[in-house]
Amino acid sequence: TFTQYFHDPANQYTISDNCIKHLLCDNQKRIWVGSMKGLNLYNKETDDFIPISTNGSVFWLMQNSQNEICYLINNTLCIMNPVTYVTERFQFGDEHKIYFLYEDNDKRLWVGMWDSGLKWFDRKNHKLVDANLTMENGKNFNNSQVNYIVETLEGNLMLATREGVLIYDRQANRLINYYQREQSCGLSENTIISLYRDKANNIWIGTYGGGVNLYTPYSNFFIPHKPEYKLQKSIGNINAIVEYKEKLWLGTDGGLIIYNPKDESYEYCPLHVPRSVTNNEVKY
């Protein structure tokens, strides 16, 4: 069963808006909710929500290695102390459309951009530094949209773009490989929406209408999974992937799906959200 929470204009301790953009469960098991109208923190004792920020649409949340909560509001990177709520704000110009945040094992904060590739955040100098997304053959992805980032077992960054999967060597600052549907690599769709590295170091790749692709360590090919075929149900895009109790939970346009890798079975979980415009869509 699912418990549902809605915005109530008469109650400041409800979620700020019904359009939820992102969720974060931090290392203290607290749940942060980013919506179209701000940031909320779930209060488990009172079963309601504490308003943290009402300054705009929050569309990405993460916790860094210093336990700070990092989130994006338009072109502003916010870094907040989760105890005092004191927040540093780093505002960038309109030419920098920030889309995604990821901290690697060396504690560097990487920023996926809407239309200008990959950058990393130089906190000391309050600026974004370009990463080089150019192959040795001259093929260039520096103007790509980077939707998602994960670190591979080898320490490289895998980037999700609208032009396939990119592999970036962060030590050498260069692109070392890219995969597209047109190649004989098994990738089912070029527009990649989500990435997830599981406990076995496999990387699961959520696509725009092309199901899920599995990328295993030390391989250069992808194994496509099509949940809609086994479920006989249209699920659309794979928006998010999370591992929980040895199963993968997939947030899709058509609802929540639970995948069991042991027997390769799928379970569909209908949500039945009242008054929902997007019906069963699960973003995260």
Which stretches of residues belong to each language-model region?
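Carboxylate-rich, polar loop motifs that coordinate divalent cations or form catalytic acidic clusters
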Residues: 1-284
